[in-house]
Amino acid sequence: MKRRTARERAMQALYQMDITGELEPKIAVENTLDEGEETNEFLESLVVGFVENKEVIDEAIRQNLKKWKLERISIVDRSILRVAVYEMKYMEEIPHNVTINEAIEIAKTFGDEESRRFINGVLSNIKDTL
C-alpha cells in the first residue's frame, strides 16, 4: 500500500470513529480496506497514534484556527487535519512540506472547494510552531 493510500485510509478511519464515537481503531482501519487488501504499519501507526495523542493534536489544531472551532469544521477536514498533524508532530522522518502537500491532495479528493486552502493555511501555521 502506498503512503498516499494509507493516509486516505487513515482519514477515512478517523472519519468513521468521529461519526460513531466508539469504534475501535483496528476495526475502523479494517472497515476502510478493500476486499483482499491488507493494512500496513504506516496506516495503523497513523490511526493508533492519533487516538493515543488526540488531546495534544486537537489542541494544536484549535490554537491555529482563526474564527473557527474544531467542532464546527467538517468531519472530513477535521480528519485530514488530525492525520496530518499527527504525522507532523510524531513522524519526524517525514518532511513537513510532504505531509502538507499530501493533506492538500487528499482534501482535493475528499473535501469541498474550500478544503484545500483551509487545510493548507492551518497546517502551515502549525508547521511554524513546531
From Swiss-Prot:
> What's the family?
Belongs to the NusB family.
What domain of life? Bacteria
The record's listing under SUPFAM superfamilies reads: NusB-like
Q: Which UniProt keyword terms apply here?
A: RNA-binding, Transcription, Transcription antitermination, Transcription regulation
Write the protein's name.
Transcription antitermination protein NusB
Q: Which GO terms describe its molecular function?
A: RNA binding
Entry's Gene Ontology cellular component terms: cytosol
Q: What HAMAP family does UniProt report for this protein, alphabetically?
A: NusB
> Has keyword Transcription regulation?
yes
Q: Which GO terms describe its biological process?
A: DNA-templated transcription termination; transcription antitermination
The record describes the protein's role as: Involved in transcription antitermination. Required for transcription of ribosomal RNA (rRNA) genes. Binds specifically to the boxA antiterminator sequence of the ribosomal RNA (rrn) operons.
